[in-house]
From Swiss-Prot:
Principal location listed in the UniProt entry: secreted
Protein family per UniProt: Belongs to the cationic peptide 02 (oxyopinin-2) family.
Protein's recorded name: M-oxotoxin-Ot2c
Gene Ontology CC terms, in alphabetical order: extracellular region
Length: 37
């Protein structure tokens, strides 16, 4: 029904934000390493 469609969308959004958070963390660590050198 309608509810399962909504939960599917929410799950996709959550996965997207988790991926973005991971990428931002890696980017921050990389730029920190850059500064230290």
């Amino acid at each position: 029904g309608k509810l399962s469609g909504i939960s599917k969308v929410l799950r996709a959004i959550a996965k997207f934000f988790k991926g973005v958070g991971k990428a931002r963390k890696q980017f921050k660590e990389a730029s920190d390493l850059d500064k230290n050198q």
